[in-house]
A protein has these predicted regions:
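Acidic, serine/threonine- and proline-rich intrinsically disordered appendage/tail regions
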Residues: 161-192
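Tryptophan-paired
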Residues: 3-172
Length: 192
């Protein structure tokens, strides 16, 4: 976790509940192609069970400082549904578009007061691109001393190895290390 410099928050903390991988290919090509991978009507994908973080570290005040987990999967190389243009956008804004979802107004949400829209498909990410969901509770004290708690699920599409927002590839025989920095309910930073 890292407090954004423009916020007067204190005690920023994350209590991880678990993680899971979504859209793991159940098959892979025996030999690599120059572009793309096994895809089409006969291809299947699965979602792993939610697992606890393998490591978590806390400071002297018992505030979350880091955590981690490891997984292995077949390659999954996808072309974006829609390319992200870098014109006039910072790297952080380009990255945020990778996780952008379409929002559907499907009517009345009497069971969810205040909700007007339902999340739809990803706007830029391809339908079968692999992503990791990390869930937990994010909390902090705001600048008025009020404690803010939120049950959160952060989505991180794999790829982005060279900072390219249109890269959704996970290549075979490649080790990726993702460093995810939580900076708030709607704010994460990623290094690959």
């Amino acid at each position: 976790t890292e407090k954004p410099s423009d916020k007067n928050w204190t005690a920023l903390d994350f209590r991880p509940r678990g993680w899971r991988v979504v859209n793991v290919p159940a098959q892979s090509l025996l030999l690599p192609h120059g572009t793309g991978d096994a895809d089409g009507d006969g291809c299947t994908y699965f979602t792993t069970e939610e697992m606890p973080f393998e490591t978590t570290e806390r400071d002297d005040n018992y505030l979350y400082t880091s955590g981690g987990f490891v997984f292995y999967m077949p390659e999954n190389r996808k072309t974006p549904k829609q390319a992200i243009s870098g014109e006039g956008l910072s790297a952080a804004e380009q990255y945020a578009l990778r996780e952008e979802r379409e929002h559907k107004n499907t009517g009345d949400y009497t069971d969810k007061p205040g909700q007007q829209f339902e999340n739809g498909d990803f706007a830029y990410a391809p339908a079968n691109a692999t992503y990791v969901e990390m869930s937990g509770t994010l909390s902090y004290k705001d600048d008025k001393g009020n404690t803010v708690n939120a049950d959160v699920t952060f989505t991180v599409h794999l790829g982005y190895a060279d900072g390219n927002p249109n890269d959704y590839d996970t290549r075979r025989n490649t080790r990726y290390i993702y460093t995810v920095t939580l900076r708030g309910i709607n704010d994460i930073r990623l290094e690959v």
